[in-house]
Design a protein with these regions (language model features):
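Beta/alpha (TIM)-barrel catalytic core signal, keyed to glycine-rich beta->alpha loops juxtaposed to Asp/Glu
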Residues: 1-136
Length: 136
């Protein structure tokens, strides 16, 4: 989930004491660093059929990941941790639910709680372009 899309929804949830649970906050793997091209996806991977993973959209979206990486490196975090920390910065009622297939991903995802993003980092992330291609 892109925190910019939460907008008033996150604030309204907090006002009402309702949790907001962003689904697929790591962009279905974009932010994990597991692939850098369409060909890296297994032949039977459902993402091969999703618009955001088609060749042109994939290139544009991986460029966005590169910009997230530029925020992550100076704070000693991974792009996935920065994405989760960005969501956590939206407030205590925002609880991202990332996929966690391996112990390594569990450790990486949990590490997001220790990532401190500055106001400048948050502004840089907020200025990123929206992902290319429809979500589904």
């Amino acid at each position: 989930m892109d925190p910019r899309r939460a907008g008033r929804g996150a604030a309204l949830c907090e006002e009402q004491g309702i949790a907001l649970l962003p689904f697929a906050p790591l962009g279905r793997g974009f932010l994990t660093g597991r692939f850098s091209s369409f060909d890296d996806l297994p032949q039977d991977d459902f993402r091969r059929r999703l618009p955001r993973f088609q060749q042109d959209a994939l290139r544009a979206n991986l460029a966005i990941v590169g910009r997230v990486r530029q925020v992550a490196e100076p704070v000693g975090a991974t792009p996935a941790q920065v994405a989760l920390a960005w969501l956590l910065a939206e407030g205590r009622y925002v609880v991202p639910i990332p996929g966690t297939k391996t112990p390594k991903y569990l450790t990486d995802n949990a590490g997001a709680a220790d990532v401190e993003l500055s106001a400048a980092d948050l502004a840089e992330l907020d200025a990123l372009p929206a992902p290319e291609g429809a979500r589904y």
